[in-house]
Amino acid sequence: MAAPAACTRFSDNYDIKEELGKGAFSIVKRCVQKSTGFEFAAKIINTKKLTARDFQKLEREARICRKLHHPNIVRLHDSIQEENYHYLVFDLVTGGELFEDIVAREFYSEADASHCIQQILESVNHCHQNGVVHRDLKPENLLLASKAKGAAVKLADFGLAIEVQGDHQAWFGFAGTPGYLSPEVLKKEPYGKSVDIWACGVILYILLVGYPPFWDEDQHRLYSQIKAGAYDYPSPEWDTVTPEAKNLINQMLTVNPNKRITAAEALKHPWICQRERVASVVHRQETVDCLKKFNARRKLKGAILTTMLATRNFSSRSMITKKGEGSQVKESTDSSSTTLEDDDIKEDKKGTVDRSTTVVSKEPEDIRILCPAKTYQQNIGNSQCSSARRQEIIKITEQLIEAINSGDFDGYTKICDPHLTAFEPEALGNLVEGIDFHKFYFENVLGKNCKAINTTILNPHVHLLGEEAACIAYVRLTQYIDKQGHAHTHQSEETRVWHKRDNKWQNVHFHRSASAKISGATTFDFIPQK
């Protein structure tokens, strides 16, 4: 008779601590091993919500992670199955994302990029030596072991990883993150370990200049760029990158997977193994600046898509990355959006894609290929322009409120359209048109005898409505001192519509809520001095 199984219940071996983050069917918590006091990150999966296919993915992820023991890979220490929950106990990595750390550094050079990609290639090479293809290499899965200077880079999230025999290639399904997908995956051809090298090439390109080699807001055009291998090295940012670095990128971003460099070969490339002699050590401030924008963009895209997409694939959405200062959880985000697997793609009888669960779409055959680097930079420029216009709207709104506070009717009329419309408490629910209604308050309440007041705009939200119109919504807090020296504050919620005429912004409509009086009267009813 077999010996009884050892006690493996999670709570018997670990103390659960605070939550680090959560995914669709899982939650990540810090835990402490009772016997040693060591800290780990426990990925806790609610198995009641899983399908049979999800169970297979979970078992595959655990099986693969158990095979991998390398200083540059987030290690799985324990896998515990209970009645309704499965626990995966990983390294607790506390250094955050590699890309976020780079932008916080005082110095960053080509040699630093070489050291980063070397560690990534070491992890990939270990995977490939053990018959594992990661399939989802991207910045979000590159973490740092700790906050210490020179901390090791750790490859995380094996939710999409597969097992292969040797150099065998087959169609293992459509999986990965759009901006990092290889041509063979997009062409739905047999593939293998070389898909990871392609993704490493994309990552190295970003490490050197701060933006990706393939990029387009339209996913159709993005996929066409990738399948054609349409990338370049635009001036001036690439002029200062050594030829050896470009040579390695070219060998990684080779469209033919059979001619693509392997991880072992890449580690022997002069730019990697002889970096002290080959790689430049000049600080790359423009790369850092561009990488900050790249990081912000992918985080924003990820946040938006996380709210839009509820895919069935749980395992690629929740592992270990940053959450606060000392702990990590992983949510899939990227400038090219969400991690995808073929299970997520539902086609109807006509072959069109069900967009209710995924952003993947069919690729048209004839699409004009644009220079991705220039397109990316142009879009960043457009984003900066939009940001500048939002600041314009906030500033002109502040100027209008200042005119009200100071009783400057002339200044008020210059900012407002003559046919300004408004819903406001003073009009008792009626729509007021023109500024004569407001003139009464300027002449009788907001005149020269009005005490100094202070107004604060809270949480301004600006919606740009084309090039010449915008709407701003905000909370307005007004403070003033009455003639007895008592402080008063009241709050109102306001929305203003602005229109640009003759290159000047004018307020054409506003809506103000009734004041929430902490004390005091209405927005226009300020108590004059003696």
From Swiss-Prot:
Tissue/organ expression: Expressed at a high level in the central nervous system during the late embryonic stage. In adults, expression is more abundant in the head than in the body.
Q: Which GO terms describe its molecular function?
A: ATP binding; calcium/calmodulin-dependent protein kinase activity; calmodulin binding; protein serine kinase activity; protein serine/threonine kinase activity
Q: Choose any GO biological process term that the UniProt entry carries and state it.
A: learning or memory
How does this protein assemble? Answer: Interacts with CASK.
Q: Which PANTHER family match?
A: SERINE/THREONINE-PROTEIN KINASE (PTHR24347)
Which residues in this protein are found as Phosphoserine? S327
User: Which superkingdom, per the lineage?
Assistant: Eukaryota
Q: Where does ATP bind?
A: L20, G21, K22, G23, A24, F25, S26, I27, V28, K43
List the catalytic residues. Answer: D136
Specify the effect of T306A.
Answer: Fails to interact with CASK, catalytically active but fails to autophosphorylate
Quote the PTM field.
Autophosphorylation at Thr-287 is independent of autophosphorylation at Thr-306 and Thr-307.
Species lineage: Eukaryota, Metazoa, Ecdysozoa, Arthropoda, Hexapoda
Q: Where is this region: Calmodulin-binding?
A: 291-301
Region annotation Disordered: where it falls in the sequence: 320-358
Q: Which UniProt keywords apply?
A: ATP-binding, Calmodulin-binding, Kinase, Nucleotide-binding, Phosphoprotein, Serine/threonine-protein kinase, Transferase
Q: What is its EC number?
A: 2.7.11.17
Spell out the reaction equation it catalyses.
L-seryl-[protein] + ATP = O-phospho-L-seryl-[protein] + ADP + H(+); L-threonyl-[protein] + ATP = O-phospho-L-threonyl-[protein] + ADP + H(+)
Q: Which gene encodes it?
A: CaMKII
Organism of provenance: Drosophila melanogaster
Query: GO CC annotation: what is one?
Result: postsynaptic density
Give the family per the record. Answer: Belongs to the protein kinase superfamily. CAMK Ser/Thr protein kinase family. CaMK subfamily.
Gene3D superfamilies per record: 3.10.450.50, 6.10.140.620, Phosphorylase Kinase, domain 1, Transferase(Phosphotransferase) domain 1
- The modified positions for Phosphothreonine read T287, T306, T307
Q: What protein name applies here?
A: Calcium/calmodulin-dependent protein kinase type II alpha chain
Domain Protein kinase, by residue range, is 12-272
Keyword Ion transport part of the UniProt annotation? no
Tell me, in a sentence or two, what this protein's role is: A key regulator of plasticity in synaptic physiology and behavior, alterations in its activity produce pleiotrophic effects that involve synaptic transmission and development as well as various aspects of behavior. Directly modulates eag potassium channels.
Q: Any inhibitors or activators noted?
A: CASK plays a role in regulation of CaMKII autophosphorylation. When complexed with CASK and in the presence Ca[2+]/CaM, autophosphorylation of Thr-287 causes constitutive activation of the kinase. In the absence of Ca[2+]/CaM, autophosphorylation of Thr-306 causes inactivation of the kinase.
